[in-house]
Regions:
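Active-site-proximal helix-loop-helix substrate-binding element of RNase H-like nuclease domains
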Residues: 13, 17-20, 24-44, 55-150, ...
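Conserved catalytic core of nucleic-acid polymerases
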Residues: 174, 199, 228, 232, ...
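Short acidic alpha-helix initiation/capping motifs at coil-to-helix transition points
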Residues: 61, 167-168, 266, 427, ...
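Conserved "right-hand" nucleotidyltransferase catalytic core of DNA-directed polymerases
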Residues: 2-4, 8, 112-115, 123-380, ...
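Short, glycine-/Ser/Thr-/acidic-enriched flexible segments
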Residues: 9-10, 27-29, 63-64, 271, ...
Length: 584
């Protein structure tokens, strides 16, 4: 038996102190409705009696809101079996932009009543809204189970294995929300001030190097050149003075003259691009955009990732001031992170790590401010991450990671088709990036050995000469390009994309791309022999990929994503499984 329920309260968790009502619909094992009701202004005994029912409770975001709120308000302690239709919505409908009951209600033709006042309306108004939410969610739950039966061929055990897995992930999200991190506000404000100052310095350096921004206007020959007495008019005198200044003859009818001259603006993409083109810029990074006519145009991009595009970095030797543009990109991003930290912090200076959904591999999509934070190795990354501190002396901030997780899961799949290469990768000291660099000709064997020798010295904190350090940095750039193809290749990156990312020529990027796939042909074989199917549900086709480790089906947008989806899904499942073992 299932009980689809919802509640209405006078606010969110941490604010609400009253539950207006609980509404529900009971379903039998065949999902037939066998009863419904509402509990206005429930007291503690009624709430506990409701949750003592022999049923599986179904709700939308109940793991992170409804049930925790019930525990807060009524002291509910018993554990209950649940199905959260929000988590299932994230899983089943990857193309939906929004997953709230309001959006699903539109699909089902059941409008969600709008209420903005959660304190002073009648109980009946809150009950009505709650009842309509239950109607929407009942339809959604029935649809979701029907869809899951198609995907999992009616295997109920596997369906509920998936549901329990999603439940655990949502419970992890709840734990994050229940344990907010504190922002070191004083240090954040200090860092923000320093970065703002650095931003001004970089902008000033760019302004000093950029061409001035000049605008022009057209001056036409005066219509009236002479007065009635035959003398030149004032306009005519000014015109003739202009012709003399410009070295033009009397036959001239119009002259283009300078209207204004201002310092260049680093914030103007048009001015920056004009400057770059004057320096010989050949763009390699583009963004497809539609114009008003619906035609798609590839627009050259100044930035790619954390900094400027590789094609602009090629111009650093010609115009060193462009390094300020690269740095300015990083500074602006870090300023944005700091401002978000400060704006999202509550009155205690704390922020929550919240989630916005699942990726197709069931990883979390994270909400700001704790999302896509720079690595400690990147510019201001250590300082930014250091701003997240424990809320008090009774807590400690800790984290966990698994070394080479995705590389290990990748080797698991590759082993079935190329055990020899996997055995090589498992040898201590093997560097897959150096391997690709050698095979592609990015590095010679002697350079590879020299890189390893100097790296060992640096790892052991032994002294190196200035010459060795210069050599290491040069070789490390070559290794970085090989590393790019190792990571990007597995996600289906084309030679053009590699050229754009690395700054290498397209012919060499093609060679690098071919080298990668010659070495990693087993990746294609894994993808080729993967288990896929396409479902038709509600008039929409959806590709699905089966993961033999997790035994889940993952939504798939493009066939080029088969291996990366398989690999990332396995890594996520392995990480969660080990977390469960630690907890148990």
């Amino acid at each position: 038996m299932f009980t689809v329920f919802d509640l209405e309260s006078n606010g969110l968790r941490g604010v609400a102190d009253k539950c207006w009502c609980i509404c529900y619909t009971d379903l039998n094992s065949d999902l037939e409705e066998i009863g419904s009701g509402s509990i206005p202004l429930p007291d503690t005994e009624k709430v506990k009696e409701f949750f003592r029912k022999e049923t599986t409770f179904v709700g939308h975001n109940i793991i992170r809101f409804d049930i925790p709120l019930i525990r807060d308000l009524y002291g509910l302690t018993q554990e209950v079996e649940v199905v959260d239709t929000l988590g299932l919505s994230w899983y089943l409908y990857p193309n939906l932009l929004k997953h709230g009951l309001e959006e699903h209600g539109v699909r089902f033709g059941i409008p969600k009543p709008v209420i903005k006042d959660w304190d002073s309306l009648t109980v009946e108004e809150y009950v009505y809204r709650c009842e309509e939410d239950v109607k929407i969610n009942t339809q959604l739950f029935k649809e979701q189970l029907a869809y899951l039966k198609i995907i999992y061929s009616g295997d109920t055990e596997r369906i509920f294995n998936l549901i329990n897995y999603l439940n655990f992930k949502l419970d992890c999200a709840l734990e994050q929300e229940n344990n907010p991190l504190k922002i070191d506000v004083e240090s954040a404000e200090d860092s923000l001030e320093k970065l703002e100052q650095l931003k001004f310095e970089k902008e000033d350096a760019l302004i000093a190097s950029m061409p001035a921004h000049v605008t022009f206007r057209t001056v036409n020959k005066p219509a009236k050149m002479f007065t009635v007495k035959g003398d030149l008019t004032k306009a005519a005198l000014a015109w003739e003075s202009l012709l003399v200044a410009e070295g033009l003859g009397p036959e001239t009818e119009s002259v283009v003259v300078e209207k204004s001259r201002e310092p260049g603006k680093p914030t103007s993409s048009t001015q920056i691009k004009n400057w770059l083109y004057a320096l010989g810029w050949e763009p390699c990074t583009f963004e497809a955009r539609k114009n008003k006519q619906g035609d798609i145009k590839n627009v050259p991009q100044i930035y790619a990732g954390d900094g400027v595009a590789p094609s602009i970095k090629k111009l650093f030797d010609i115009e060193p001031a462009l390094e300020n543009l690269d740095m300015l990109s990083l500074i602006n991003h870090r300023i944005g992170v700091l401002k978000t930290f400060l704006s999202k912090a509550d009155d205690k200076g704390c922020v929550q790590a919240t989630v916005a959904g699942f990726t197709n591999t069931l990883r979390f999509r994270h909400n700001k401010p704790i999302a896509n934070l720079p690595s400690p190795k990147k510019f201001y990354g250590k300082e930014i991450r250091g701003l997240l501190i424990a809320p008090d002396d009774e807590h400690v901030v800790c984290g966990s990671d698994m070394s080479a997780l995705e590389d290990t899961t990748k080797q698991h799949y590759m082993y079935f088709y190329d055990p020899e290469y996997v055995e090589q990768m498992r040898v201590p000291g093997f560097d897959p990036h150096i391997d690709i660099a050698l095979l592609s000709g990015l590095m010679t064997k002697e350079e590879a050995e020299e890189f390893k020798r100097i790296k060992k010295l640096l790892d052991n904190k032994e002294p190196v000469t200035d010459e060795e350090l210069i050599t290491f940095k040069s070789l490390d750039k070559k290794r970085a390009n090989a590393k790019t193809v190792n990571f990007a290749g597995i996600y289906g990156a084309s030679p053009a994309k590699l050229a754009e990312t690395t700054g290498l020529t397209l012919p060499f990027a093609k060679k690098l791309h071919q080298t990668y796939w010659n070495r990693n042909q087993s990746v294609k074989l894994v993808a080729k022999h993967s288990i896929r199917k396409t479902t038709m549900f509600n008039g929409e086709e959806q590709m699905w990929l089966y993961n033999p480790v997790s035994k889940f089906w993952y939504s798939l947008r493009y066939e080029k994503d088969i291996f990366s989806t398989l690999n990332q899904g396995t890594g996520d499942n392995y990480l969660i499984t080990n977390q469960l073992r630690l907890i148990i």
